[in-house]
Amino acid sequence: MIRQFVSHRGIPCYRLAVRRVELTEPFHHPSPWPLGRKNWSTSDEAKSKRAAMRKGGAPPPEHEDWELTVGIEIHAQLDTDAKLFSSASAALDDVPNSNIALFDIALPGSQPLFQPSTLIPAIRAAIALNCDVQRVSRFDRKHYFYQDQPAGYQITQYYEPYAKNGSIWLGAHDGIAKEDGEGVQIGIKQIQMEQDTAKSQELPSSTYLLDFNRVSRPLIEIITLPQIHSATTAAACVRKIQAILQSVGAVTTGMEMGGLRADVNVSVRKRSEAAGDHQYDGVAGLGQRTEIKNLSSFKAVEYAIIAERDRQIAVLKAGGTIQGETRGWTLGSTETRKLRGKEGEVDYRYMPDPDLGPVIIGDDVISDLRRNIPGLPDELLQMLVQDPKYGLSTVDAKTLIELDDGQRLEYYQDAVEILTTLQPDLSADFSAGKVVGNWVLHELGGLLTKSSAHWDSQRVPAQSLAEIINLLSRKNITSSSAKSLLAMAFDGDKRSISQIVEDKNLLFQSLSRHEYLALAEEVMRQNPKMVSEIREKAQLGKMGWLVGQIKRIGDPNRVEAQKAEEILRELILK
């Protein structure tokens, strides 16, 4: 039975008394964390296919009589310091083969030792995905031989997983296909815990290096029901599940950092004909499915499904039959490729693990975790859009939620809090949330993109960003000075914002009307044709260019664009 004992990053943790457990594994190797490689074809046909993929997953007119059905299996690394079945550290960035126990490398006589703390993020994931957490679950062995699995089997939960019967709702804001309307609900068959494999690195001359630090690192596998009928919606489903897992602290990283990958099961059938002969996970009337493994980005999920959909339809139109098999897809490819024939369940030789007892989870544990579950993405989205404190657009709110494993959102909220305390006297019309959102996403985001840097909340601390925005909103500095301050802080200037402003003499000193008139008249004298076009042809859009010229010949830290334009309008349009 699990009992509460300490807190895990602020959330209660529990101790489990294990009596007995079981496991199972696969007989092929789906190499869970592959290195993507490009496989570009330069033929006109391939270029045309890639262009069609980029337009989205909607089927072309000639495919409208065909129904696509997709089920997804998502493998995610749990956010835990412990391995699943050994006392070794789960850290991945240490020296290769430095975090291993005897069981991790399957030394004879070693046995698995279940680590109860790994259950906490797993249960949080199940609750967030609306699953029924099972009071009793068991581990099984899934047998296969591959170099990165020294035991010859993987420990998983095939027969009695710890969570079942979940669901996820995808709305239009999640980026689903237009044909799915305002929203679609996807069922989740089960979530099971399983151990990761070693990390392999291929070298020339058929040489492989193996790092066993990753062996027995805890994973969860989330299996959806085959209820998705669009490649676009399938990608949106993976994206939404990743966001949910990150929001509750269940996983380490997302697809972009290699902490999550997906396999997809794809089948097609002709709508005008009788229902298909196949049934998967209780969903009947489907066509023969194929499985595409090891997809490591949202676009890979979408493009691989499109490629396999088109391949299957072409085969069936030509009078052929679809073989149940495992296929692969590589970055840049327009076609899937056969990896192997699909093995039957018997080939994995699933069997209960005799070295592990059942996992028994008490109702009090589930209730406590449910009570303390952090905000889910849809709840966060609603708050960021509807709360006057933030007032973001749906697009900006979704972007903040999805960026950098939630770290950008936390940074944004910190900056809003700080800015609000700095501005108790400002007008109610000033929206701290909107202004900070623009700076975090666009100004700071632009610097990150330009430098190809990864997100680091300490590169420009939230306090510094709030101080810059505060100075700008009070018109103590100009917009160009604010951007310069941000760039200096981003590039490593460790001085306080106030010190930089003082050292660089950036405090705004407004120009007099006489100074504005002199600058405007000089710019008009240098650009008579532009002035004539504005005056005679009412080409007011060119006024901004003249404002830029005033900034160029004047002091950019003293010129206010609005006042400069007012003077120009007065002189040109009088």
From Swiss-Prot:
Against SUPFAM superfamilies, the record matches this protein to: GatB/YqeY motif, Glutamine synthetase/guanido kinase
The organism's superkingdom is given as: Eukaryota
Q: What class of enzyme is it?
A: ligase
Q: Which PROSITE patterns match?
A: GATB
Q: Which Pfam families does the entry mention?
A: GatB_N, GatB_Yqey
UniProt xrefs under InterPro entries: Asn/Gln-tRNA_amidoTrfase_suB/E, Asn/Gln-tRNA_Trfase_suB/E_cat, Asn/Gln_amidotransferase, Asn/Gln_tRNA_amidoTrase-B-like, GatB, Gln-tRNA_amidoTrfase_suB_CS, Gln_synth/guanido_kin_cat_dom
The alphabetical list of record keywords is: ATP-binding, Ligase, Mitochondrion, Nucleotide-binding, Protein biosynthesis, Transit peptide
Entry's NCBIfam families?
gatB, PRK05477.1-2
Q: What is this protein called?
A: Glutamyl-tRNA(Gln) amidotransferase subunit B, mitochondrial
